[in-house]
């Protein structure tokens, strides 16, 4: 190690954040050439990163940024292997640089991000260098970057635990209502963060998905009814359908006639049918759209007023503000959603590292 000064080792460490012994070894390997030592460590770091890449990164953060004029917003999920690293200052700096790069280069996908420049090198190279320094696999898993056209705003909400983030876009016509629309979007984003709707509208469901979910829903209600019957409690109605997308005009017309026939058989005067049938139809629709109420943003009951669905809240605001509001964008990221984290004991971990 002769000829390798402590000052040179320190300089290399400052440039790379690598360990002291790694810096010494790198300088010895390249005969004291600083640039070659940096390259040596980078290559070594990338090699380490590749070995770490088969370990699932299921911790991390969901971060978002909304433009001051509410005309654009971005949200990103960045995964690490442990919660400890997610709180590391180096990891926080990585999150900041990721958002800055997305904004600077108008990025919409992780593929675009990895190829985009950051400090005169591809972002992917920067990411790998951080994996080597931090010592864990890090993955930029998901990105959404929304832009609002005229008469639209975008607002969002990030939970304080940095594990859930939501963006909501709303179209409006009356410019004077913009501040109220901004606030409404944030409140709806907070609702979505808590209630986890899967999609904006039932139109986003496939018919196969709805039919499958409806069968499961019916089985669930039948089981609940068995217990309710045993306890002498009222039974729930068994639905025929699960979503509004199944309630065609023909289905609704058929049901309306069935209610009218029922009233006729009961001897109810026809002149009062119009006062009874709408309520029955409303109940029929409610009983046969339970999937929408559980899984769609517009169909869920608002956490701040559980007598109204989100769709009804938006409609009421439109009427009150003399406007025509419509939710046009809905993005929700939850940390690690869909990832199954491996359970490994310490002995297995050591054995894996020795391979």
From Swiss-Prot:
It is found in: Cytoplasm. InterPro entries: EF-Ts_dimer_sf, Transl_elong_EFTs/EF1B, Transl_elong_EFTs/EF1B_dimer, Transl_elong_Ts_CS, UBA-like_sf. One of its GO terms (biological process) is translational elongation. Pfam families: EF_TS. CDD domains: UBA_EF-Ts. The keyword Cytoplasm applies. The keyword Cytoplasm applies. GO terms for cellular component: cytoplasm. Its main location: cytoplasm. Belongs to the EF-Ts family. Associates with the EF-Tu.GDP complex and induces the exchange of GDP to GTP. It remains bound to the aminoacyl-tRNA.EF-Tu.GTP complex up to the GTP hydrolysis stage on the ribosome. This is Elongation factor Ts.
């Amino acid at each position: 190690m002769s000829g390798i000064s402590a000052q040179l080792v320190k300089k290399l460490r400052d440039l790379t954040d690598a360990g002291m012994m790694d810096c010494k070894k790198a300088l010895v390997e390249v005969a004291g050439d600083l640039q070659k030592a940096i390259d040596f460590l980078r290559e070594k770091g990338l090699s380490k990163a590749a070995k770490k890449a088969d370990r699932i990164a299921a911790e991390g953060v969901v971060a978002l940024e909304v433009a001051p004029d509410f005309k654009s917003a971005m949200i990103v999920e960045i995964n690490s292997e442990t919660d400890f690293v997610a709180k590391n200052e180096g990891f926080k700096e990585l999150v900041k640089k990721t958002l800055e790069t997305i904004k600077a280069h108008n990025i919409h996908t992780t593929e675009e991000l990895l190829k985009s420049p950051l400090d005169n090198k591809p972002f992917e190279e920067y990411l790998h260098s951080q994996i080597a320094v931090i010592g864990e696999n890090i993955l930029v898993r998901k990105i959404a970057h929304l832009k609002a056209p005229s008469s639209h705003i975008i607002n969002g909400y990030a939970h304080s635990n940095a594990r859930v983030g939501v963006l909501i876009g709303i179209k409006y016509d009356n410019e004077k209502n913009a501040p109220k629309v901004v606030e409404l979007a944030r409140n709806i984003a907070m609702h979505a963060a808590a209630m986890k709707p899967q999609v904006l509208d039932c139109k986003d469901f496939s018919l196969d998905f709805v039919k499958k979910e409806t069968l499961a829903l019916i089985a669930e209600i039948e089981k609940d009814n068995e217990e309710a019957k045993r306890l002498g409690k009222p039974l729930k109605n068994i639905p025929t359908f699960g979503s509004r997308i199944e309630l065609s005009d023909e289905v609704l017309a058929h049901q309306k006639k069935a209610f009218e026939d029922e009233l006729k058989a009961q001897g109810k005067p026809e002149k009062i049918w119009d006062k009874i049938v709408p309520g029955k139809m409303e109940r029929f629709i409610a009983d046969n759209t339970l999937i929408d109420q559980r899984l769609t943003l517009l169909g869920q009951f608002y956490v701040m007023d559980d007598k109204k669905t989100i769709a009804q809240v938006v409609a009421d605001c439109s009427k009150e503000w003399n406007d025509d509001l419509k939710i046009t964008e809905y993005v929700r990221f939850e940390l690690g959603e869909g990832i199954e984290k491996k359970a490994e004991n310490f002995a297995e971990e050591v054995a894996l590292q020795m391979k």
